[in-house]
């Protein structure tokens, strides 16, 4: 159930938000980059994290989450299943590492953007960019918390049982 919530809420949000924020970031970097060069770095960092998150979601949706669902079904039916990648802990460690990378990138973006605070002269696109970046980071924190602290430990526990 939690994996479905993460997929339907957080993964959908990420997929819908990435292109919107990317467009804002690129526009703000182009228009305001000369006077506010931090926006060029923000656009670059957001592009990097976009590429990483797209790959990350594909791995979770294509490999890890289906396996966790199969573990839960097998546990409920008192069955065992084969694990194609040794232990569920292997892909979980990889996902947690990728979560750390995304979190670190957003810490840099937060610092560069003065805690997502646009300058007084900011246009509406500039303000929207910082608003969306803050909103995205907030969702990412919840998303990572649900996976790292609830879903993944439960999957490891199910595999041991």
Residue spans for each PLM region:
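Small-residue-biased structural context
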Residues: 1-161
